[in-house]
Design a protein with these regions (language model features):
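Extracytoplasmic gate region of multi-pass secondary transporters
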Residues: 33-34, 224-277, 367, 371
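C-terminal ends and interior cores of transmembrane alpha-helices
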Residues: 96-109, 301-316
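Cytosolic juxtamembrane N-terminal segment immediately preceding the first transmembrane helix
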Residues: 1-34
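Helix-breaking motifs and short loop linkers at transmembrane-helix boundaries and internal kinks
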Residues: 86, 107-113, 141, 291, ...
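Conserved MFS/SLC helix-loop-helix module at the cytosolic interface between two early adjacent transmembrane helices
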Residues: 73-109
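Glycine-rich segments within core transmembrane alpha-helices of 12-TM secondary carriers
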Residues: 144-172, 187, 360-371
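Cytoplasmic membrane-interface "Motif A"-like loop-to-helix N-cap segments
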Residues: 84-95, 288-300
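Extracellular/periplasmic helix-loop-helix junction of adjacent transmembrane segments
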Residues: 36-73
Length: 415
């Protein structure tokens, strides 16, 4: 009985640590869209910009791209570290990295300073996802995985919504944005909790006893190459859709209101975040219910339709805009409840953190190209909506690719 209680306590500690780690990731991701406009406008004279909209759009795209590339390299590096040294120690270091370097954004004087610091912060964020997912999926029984996948996926969007609520009550200006970044250093305390209280994965311990893994080589080896490349493609499609369009919704809201409604950005971000929490919870259950492949196909189809309605059919800030923001935020985020369920099922324990990290975060590199493209499209079209309408066509590709992947519903995690 004592052993069972200890196991249950360990499972809950793992879940809480992974949830908080990914929630704070979402908070860190939500910070920049909230502060981007005042921060970049403050820095514009140092660079010599003349058009605020074009300057903000261009640098928003560049900094978002750097963020995504940093997350990709972080996912690879910390995933490798998690397979070699253990999930817990690697996750502690990842949380510490993103907390400290978010806080250091306080000292940025030029846009490239922000870009460099966001790159390193993202390095830590990219690692936390793959490590947290591996820990949870290895600690809990198979029957709980669809629900827990949704819970973990929703965590980032809880953080995203929380930072938006802050923006609703605390006006972010050219004088105050730096203090928002300082608040982003708070998750450093979580790193200490992880190191002191969270138990290491028993599956990883058993796998480590069997010999030294070569995780990077193996995930790109003949046995796993197809799974790895398909997982990268699936992550890329979802991430391009999110970072190339949905992340720009607060800026679009600000543009639609002409800057006369300071709360418009925060309300947009809150509704998108709340929709995303619901979507993530349902995404894992959706995949667990009808199967991994039909679920991904359905999410791509719904995302394609709803994004088309939002970006092509809505032309002013109001009730219709806010309803569509909620729906688009939900369906495009449901992928992030599906990924924690499906990606662990594609890789054995000895390389699971690396495989997930490579797949999900290599997708971020391609999403970085999407963010850069979005920035250029905003300049070209002079419209966030037209740019978003083009980028979100990427979901059509996912509707075909998913049928090349294995169906894993009802199968245990590979050892």
């Amino acid at each position: 009985m004592t052993e069972l209680k200890r196991d249950a306590k360990g499972q809950w500690l793992v879940l809480v640590a992974a949830f908080l780690g990914w929630m704070f990731d979402g908070l860190e991701m939500g910070i920049f869209p909230l502060v981007a406009r005042p921060a970049l406008q403050e820095m514009m004279p140092a660079i010599g910009g003349t058009s605020p909209d074009q300057f903000v759009g261009l640098w928003m795209g560049r900094i978002t791209a750097l963020f995504l590339v940093g997350a990709a390299f972080g996912g690879l590096s910390f995933g490798w570290l998690g397979d070699r040294l253990g999930r817990v120690r690697a996750m502690m270091l990842s949380v510490l990295t993103y907390s400290v370097f978010t806080g250091l954004c306080y000292f940025a004087k030029e846009p490239w300073h922000l870009g460099a610091l966001r790159f390193v912060a993202a390095f830590g964020m990219g690692g936390e996802w793959s490590l947290g997912v591996a820990l949870v999926m290895e600690a809990w029984p198979e029957g709980k995985r669809p629900l827990l996948a949704g819970v973990i996926g929703a965590a980032a969007n809880v953080g995203f919504a929380l930072i938006a609520v802050l923006g609703l009550f605390f006006k972010v200006t050219q004088d105050s944005w730096r203090w928002v970044m300082v608040a982003g250093a708070a998750p450093a305390a979580l790193a200490l909790m992880i190191q002191l209280f969270v138990p290491e994965s028993e599956r990883w311990k058993e796998s480590a006893k069997r010999g030294v893994a070569r995780p990077v080589k193996e995930v790109f080896g003949a046995g796993l190459l197809k799974n790895t490349l398909l997982a990268i493609a699936f992550a890329s499609i979802a991430l391009i859709g999110t970072w190339g369009s949905v992340q720009w919704l607060p800026l679009w809201a600000d543009k639609l209101t002409g800057g006369t409604m300071p709360q418009a950005k925060a309300v947009t971000q809150i509704l998108s975040g709340v929709g995303a929490v619901v979507g993530c919870m349902l995404g894992g259950l959706f995949g667990g219910g009808i199967g991994r492949r039909p679920a991904y196909f359905g999410l791509c189809l719904m995302s394609l339709i709803l994004c088309a309605v939002l970006f092509r059919g809505v032309h002013e800030y109001g009730g219709m805009f806010l309803v569509m923001v909620f729906l688009v935020g939900g369906v495009t985020a449901a992928f992030y409840g599906w990924f924690p369920l499906y990606l662990p099922e594609l890789f054995p324990t000895r390389v699971r953190a690396t495989g997930q990290g490579v797949s999900y975060n290599a997708g971020r590199i391609l999403a970085a190209a999407g963010a850069l493209t979005q920035g250029q499209l905003v300049v070209f079209y002079g419209s966030y909506a037209k740019a978003g309408a083009v980028v979100t066509l990427i979901y059509a590709l996912g509707m075909g690719l998913i049928w090349l992947a294995p169906e894993t519903k009802g199968k245990p995690l590979p050892e």
